[in-house]
Regions:
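Bacterial N-terminal signal peptides that target proteins for export
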Residues: 1-12
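A short, solvent-exposed beta-edge/loop patch
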Residues: 169-260
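N-terminal low-complexity, Pro/Thr-rich disordered segments
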Residues: 11, 18-56, 78-112, 221-247, ...
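Compositionally biased, intrinsically disordered low-complexity segments
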Residues: 11-19, 66, 71, 255-256
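A small/polar (G/S/T-enriched), proline-flanked helix-loop surface module common
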Residues: 51, 55, 67-205, 251-252
């Protein structure tokens, strides 16, 4: 098993790699999101009020293979102002999902908000997916999406801080063709000697923003234990390796948008 020092070195190497990839993040990425579509015929949205959002929130019956829970209110998002104001929306959306402090605070300008946390029902998966619904005035919802695109286009947002929390490896991802418009991106942040990696998709449907945040933890010690187990002819625990970024399950996205 690797020593604690080598585990830290391994984690830092992931951070360095993320920082390197961040330099090209946002370049040539129309995938920072899909352009807003022409307004569709009006239909009731979950943004009509808190009770509507609660009814639209996911349950275990909506997505097979997942446990669905309410977020832990004891968690709290990073305190403090972003080091660069234009980068703030990228971190703010992490707090608009269902966990890691998300769901504990209503996003800025949102009228109401609900969050859920989804984990694999068999407890074998390593990815947690936070899902949040936030109701806005439609112009505010559109502006929130525009602010995300601006941040992803800015090279200054490849790495930034919110208080003492440093985010890095920011890069746009291909967004699903869902709702009126969508934006997807990834980033990472240190947690002690480990690295938390997050993939985020934000979909606007009218005045409602649906935020999906998939996350996993890169644990060098766990990876090494898995390798040692394989050498001994045993199964490892499936700890994500350095190149296994989390992914938002399309089934979760579809199930949630069907209820909005």
């Amino acid at each position: 098993v690797k020593s604690a020092v080598s585990r830290v070195v391994a984690a830092v190497s992931v951070v360095v790699a993320l920082g390197g990839s961040a330099a090209c993040g946002g370049s040539g990425d129309d995938d920072a999101g899909k352009s807003a579509k022409p307004t569709r015929s009006a239909k009731p949205h979950a943004s009509e009020g808190p009770s509507k959002l609660e009814k639209a929130a996911l349950t275990a019956a909506d997505v097979k293979g997942y446990k669905v829970e309410e977020p832990d209110d004891s968690a709290a998002p990073p305190a403090g102002k972003p080091s660069r104001a234009e980068c703030g929306p990228l971190a703010a959306m992490l707090g608009a999902g269902g966990g890691a402090g998300a769901g504990t605070d209503t996003p800025e300008k949102a009228k109401s908000h609900v969050g859920r946390v989804l984990t694999p029902a068999d407890d074998k998966g390593s990815t947690t997916t936070d899902v949040g619904l936030s109701a806005y005035a439609e112009t505010d919802a559109e502006q929130a999406m525009a602010d995300l695109r601006t941040a992803l286009r800015s090279k200054k947002c490849a790495a930034f801080r919110v208080g003492e929390q440093r985010y890095l490896g920011v890069r746009s991802l291909s967004a699903p063709d869902k709702g009126d418009e969508a934006v997807s991106y990834k980033l990472a942040h240190r947690r002690g000697e480990y690295v938390t990696r997050e993939s985020v998709t934000v979909v606007r449907s009218g005045s409602t923003l649906a935020v999906f945040g998939a996350s996993n933890l890169y644990d060098p010690e766990g990876v090494q234990r898995d390798r040692d187990a394989e050498k001994d002819g045993m199964d490892g625990s499936g700890t994500p390796t350095a190149d296994q970024d989390p992914k938002v399950d399309p089934r979760i996205v579809d199930a949630q948008l069907d209820k909005v």
